[in-house]
């Protein structure tokens, strides 16, 4: 799905910071279940502060996330935004972005794409995306003979040749 993060653009901060919010939630809940109240309280405060900072930095009052970046919409909906008016605005803008621009999600966000569209009341759009045969799309990969989901939407070109971009392996700098 292109360089591990995004299909057409790289905006790491909203994606990585959404994971920080998620991690703080998991850690605070884990501490609570383990009976470590002081730790749970500390991580809950960090979670609240980080969530607030994320929303202030990446989500406009009109519900635009990270300059209208699809993966950021997904990560904000999945890990950051609580129920409420702002979340509903974000859902609407997310669906509108996909209708306007087509599929542009990256590796970390794509797994959450279809369920979040369904949650937003966009089941038909979710099915349209799932079944689209062009690149980017899952059916494109199947038509090209894929038996698993590729790391890049366009790992194989329509003519059957491999997209030549270097892999991000740690040995690249040795070649």
Regions found by a protein language model. Give the residues of each.
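Active-site core of glycosidic bond-cleaving carbohydrate-active enzymes
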Residues: 1-175
């Amino acid at each position: 799905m292109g360089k591990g993060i995004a299909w057409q653009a790289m905006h790491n901060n909203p994606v990585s910071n959404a994971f920080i919010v998620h991690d703080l939630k998991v850690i605070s809940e884990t501490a609570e279940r383990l009976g470590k109240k002081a730790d749970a309280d500390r991580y809950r405060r960090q979670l609240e502060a980080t969530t607030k900072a994320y929303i202030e930095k990446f989500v406009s009052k009109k519900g635009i996330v990270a300059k209208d970046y699809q993966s950021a919409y997904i990560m904000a909906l999945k890990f950051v935004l609580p129920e409420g008016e702002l979340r509903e605005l974000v859902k609407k803008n997310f669906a509108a972005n996909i209708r306007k621009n087509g599929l542009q999600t990256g590796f970390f966000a794509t797994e959450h794409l279809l369920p979040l569209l369904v949650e937003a009341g966009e089941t038909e759009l979710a099915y349209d995306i799932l079944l689209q045969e062009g690149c980017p799309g899952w059916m494109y990969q199947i038509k090209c003979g894929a038996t698993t989901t590729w790391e890049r939407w366009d790992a194989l070109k329509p003519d059957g040749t491999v997209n030549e971009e270097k892999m991000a392996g740690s040995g690249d700098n040795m070649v």
